[in-house]
């Protein structure tokens, strides 16, 4: 009996190993025929992600508050990749504008297969006591309230049309609270919570995941205290910050069929970050 069981286990193991080997050597990252919305898609990480999705075959909707930046990015994507790219102005903290964004997307493409919640806001402030109610509300609106509404509306549509994938762009500030990013870190921690909650609420047909970037050299890096950053790079395994293109692989994996059994997770893309540090230049007290 033990010998038979052992033989059966070995046969199953070989079958699983063979299937795993096939998947490992030929993962399906092809996004041809799919439509992706990328919020905050006109610059920084969002722009890199939008280009990456288009290069993989997706048509993309580029949205941010500035339509001129959206148009420039959309034109550049179409010129390079030949994919359709729709620029749409949208402040994700305004739920009425979210409704308009989805209406324009569906009018142009008839479907939504991928949502990347990338838009973010992390303003510099002098101290916790100096944070106004208006500033706090703006940070929560862009980083948490807006993504919640977008996920709710898009996941509902996806669940009725065969499925889809959502990726939230979080931050190491969600895991490593910092004195210079309190509202932002709290909002991103909430976004991590929503990632898991939405994965369970809309699974199995809709997959919801997050990437958790560390320090990337986007336009916000101009506000960093670079001497402090250089010192604290000693707490990063890669000993450096990231380039925007280095976020693309993780996002592409999560939205593609290669991640068909991955949902409800947050993947760090942070160079091996383990020690919190404050990047913003501190104003004089």
List each language-model region with its residue ranges.
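Substrate-binding pocket helix/loop in short-chain dehydrogenase/reductase
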Residues: 126-128, 132-140, 166, 221, ...
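Active-site helix of classical SDR
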Residues: 151, 187, 195
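Alpha-helical segment proximal to the catalytic Tyr-Lys
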Residues: 156, 199-204, 260
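Conserved glycine-rich cofactor-binding loop
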Residues: 35, 42-44, 66
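The beta1-alpha1 cofactor-binding region of Rossmann-like NAD(H)/NADP(H)-dependent oxidoreductases
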Residues: 67, 89-101, 133, 245
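Residue(s) in the substrate-gating loop at a strand-loop-helix junction
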Residues: 171
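Short C-terminal tail/terminal secondary-structure segment
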Residues: 3-27, 122-125, 176, 252, ...
